[in-house]
């Protein structure tokens, strides 16, 4: 006769469906904690940036915001969305992603020069140009947090930077050390993967930049859209 409460800001589709048919009771919080306001969100299409000769991972708007926060001595978090990254191939010019014609799942690039569907086994050679727009600017996504850190140091040499990922947090002590250092204003910018996204409260963070925000929509997973929503919201 015990009651169980499933707590989540982003419940799975199965759980939400069960509330709609009466199997579960849906309890909702009417207000955000501490009367917090929703942040202002800017979505930038990097394809448009490319047309204006900006080949950086950072949009011009994000660069302006970072400069502004550094000038004001406020803190910044940069999150690289790499959850489930499996080497899919996309066109930087038009955004087209190579997908399996049978499963509609993104194809994974392999060192032998082929694209493979890990659901049905379909294979095809990696194209030399985009089949949709004809651009030769087509490749597997290959940017990690270390590369982002290098780019930030180059663009913003005045900023103090911490990086938080699997390489820098191999022990519990290092994980807590990075969070403590950022909380104590020993750094201006924290760069990381999904481990920096939820469960932290840094009152002086006034800017969060999500790099490649739509990246995980193209992973070889039929739950890609659901998982992306859970991660970003």
Whereabouts are the PLM-identified features?
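Inter-lobe coupling/hinge segments of SF2-like helicase ATPases
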Residues: 1-233
């Amino acid at each position: 006769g015990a009651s169980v409460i499933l707590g989540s800001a982003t419940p799975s589709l199965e759980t939400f469906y069960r509330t709609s048919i009466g199997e579960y009771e849906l309890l909702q919080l009417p207000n955000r904690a501490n009367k917090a306001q929703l942040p202002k969100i800017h979505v930038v299409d990097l394809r448009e940036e490319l047309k204006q000769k900006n080949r950086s991972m950072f949009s011009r708007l994000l660069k302006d915001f970072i400069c502004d926060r550094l000038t004001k001595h406020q803190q910044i978090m940069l999150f690289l969305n790499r959850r489930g990254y499996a080497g899919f191939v996309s066109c930087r010019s038009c955004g087209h992603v190579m997908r399996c014609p049978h499963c509609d799942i993104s194809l994974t690039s392999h060192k032998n020069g082929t694209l493979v569907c890990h659901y049905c086994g379909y294979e095809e050679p990696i194209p030399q140009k985009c089949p949709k727009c004809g651009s030769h600017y087509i490749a597997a996504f290959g940017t990690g947090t270390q590369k982002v850190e290098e780019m930030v140091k180059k663009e913003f040499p005045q900023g103090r930077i911490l990086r938080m990922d699997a390489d820098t947090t191999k022990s519990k002590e290092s994980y807590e050390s990075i969070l403590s250092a950022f909380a104590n204003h020993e750094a201006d910018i924290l760069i990381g993967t999904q481990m920096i996204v939820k469960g932290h409260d840094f009152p002086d963070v006034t800017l969060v930049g999500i790099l490649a925000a739509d990246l995980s929509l193209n992973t070889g997973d039929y739950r890609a859209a659901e998982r992306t929503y859970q991660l970003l919201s």
